[in-house]
């Protein structure tokens, strides 16, 4: 059975370790820094079997070359981005098993945050990188609102029980923004309180469940009247299509 373990890195990154404790093997997702990965492997007596990358940003790839120097393992990453060390380029609809773990993953193209961003989907789990966050989504550094809205639609179509393993601990800021958009959403108010309590205890707020995102994440709720009304009020524009609502929400969040 595969266990997913969070490795905090930098100020707010999460590196994810997919672990088979019986085989004493692990695969790492988005290792922005090699040192905490090596420390986690040593502490649990694990050997690295693969490196998995969602997008090219350095805080998700900065540890790849150092890890490869110590562990000559395959590196899976986006085919349409330049990531040092990638030996197994991926794009939708590729599917593969993680070496040593037997964990099946399928690939979704989710451009928006970066042009070639991919997400990795297992049974009941999503490694979303910086595409979908708990309560939010990634900034549009390279893609368009239309691309990101379509990408989030793919992710939102996954089963509600899917656990979302995202790349950053941005949840409090995301939910506080979401509460500006939907102050009368009781699910959002409850989730914000739970997240605040978790952070006060020093606990992570991720993974979330896709059901939580459907109920509280404004970027997955751009089709709803209350969200559209809030976006129109902020933008001072009539927004006839959900993608226009999404684009206004993203600008609003960027400026908040």
Swiss-Prot record:
CDD domains in UniProt: hydroxyacylglutathione_hydrolase_MBL-fold
Pfam families noted in UniProt: HAGH_C, Lactamase_B
Binding site for Zn(2+) 1: 55, 57, 113, 130
Positions annotated to bind Zn(2+) 2: 59-60, 130, 168
Reaction equation(s) it catalyzes: an S-(2-hydroxyacyl)glutathione + H2O = a 2-hydroxy carboxylate + glutathione + H(+)
Pathway entry: Secondary metabolite metabolism; methylglyoxal degradation; (R)-lactate from methylglyoxal: step 2/2
GO molecular function: hydroxyacylglutathione hydrolase activity; metal ion binding
InterPro entries with a match to the protein in the record: Clx_II_MBL (IPR035680), Glyoxalase_II_hydrolase (IPR050110), HAGH_C (IPR032282), Hydroxyacylglutathione_Hdrlase (IPR017782), Metallo-B-lactamas (IPR001279), RibonucZ/Hydroxyglut_hydro (IPR036866)
Keywords for this protein: Hydrolase, Metal-binding, Zinc
Cofactor binding notes: Binds 2 Zn(2+) ions per subunit.
EC number from the UniProt entry: 3.1.2.6
Record has Hydrolase as a keyword: yes
GO BP term (any one): methylglyoxal catabolic process to D-lactate via S-lactoyl-glutathione
Major enzyme class: hydrolase
Cofactor entry: Zn(2+)
Family per similarity comment: Belongs to the metallo-beta-lactamase superfamily. Glyoxalase II family.
Quaternary structure annotation from Swiss-Prot or TrEMBL: Monomer.
Function: Thiolesterase that catalyzes the hydrolysis of S-D-lactoyl-glutathione to form glutathione and D-lactic acid.
Protein name (Swiss-Prot/TrEMBL): Hydroxyacylglutathione hydrolase
Organism, as annotated: Alkalilimnicola ehrlichii (strain ATCC BAA-1101 / DSM 17681 / MLHE-1)
């Amino acid at each position: 059975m595969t266990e997913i373990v969070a490795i905090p890195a930098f100020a707010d990154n999460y590196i994810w370790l997919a672990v088979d404790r019986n085989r004493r093997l692990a695969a790492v997702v988005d290792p922005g820094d090699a040192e905490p990965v090596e420390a986690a492997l040593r502490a649990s007596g694990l050997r690295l079997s693969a490196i998995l990358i969602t997008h090219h940003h350095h805080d998700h790839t900065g540890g790849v070359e150092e890890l490869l120097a110590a562990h000559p393992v395959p590196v899976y990453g986006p085919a349409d981005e330049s990531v040092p060390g990638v030996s197994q380029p991926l794009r939708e609809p590729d599917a593969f098993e993680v070496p040593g773990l037997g964990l099946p993953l399928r690939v979704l193209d989710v451009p928006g945050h970066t042009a070639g961003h991919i997400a990795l989907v297992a049974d009941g789990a999503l490694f979303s990188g910086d595409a979908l966050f708990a309560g939010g989504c990634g900034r549009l550094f390279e893609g368009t609102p239309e691309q990101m809205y379509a990408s989030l639609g793919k992710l939102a179509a996954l089963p509600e029980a899917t656990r979302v393993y995202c790349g950053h601990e941005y949840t409090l800021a995301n939910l506080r923004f979401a509460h500006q958009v939907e102050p009368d959403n009781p699910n959002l108010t409850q989730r914000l309180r739970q997240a605040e309590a978790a952070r006060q205890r020093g606990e992570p707020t991720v993974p979330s469940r896709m059901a939580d995102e459907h109920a509280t994440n404004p970027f997955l709720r751009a089709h709803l009247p209350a969200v559209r009304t809030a976006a129109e009020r902020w933008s001072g524009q009539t927004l006839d299509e959900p993608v226009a609502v999404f684009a206004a929400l993203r600008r609003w969040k960027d400026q908040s």
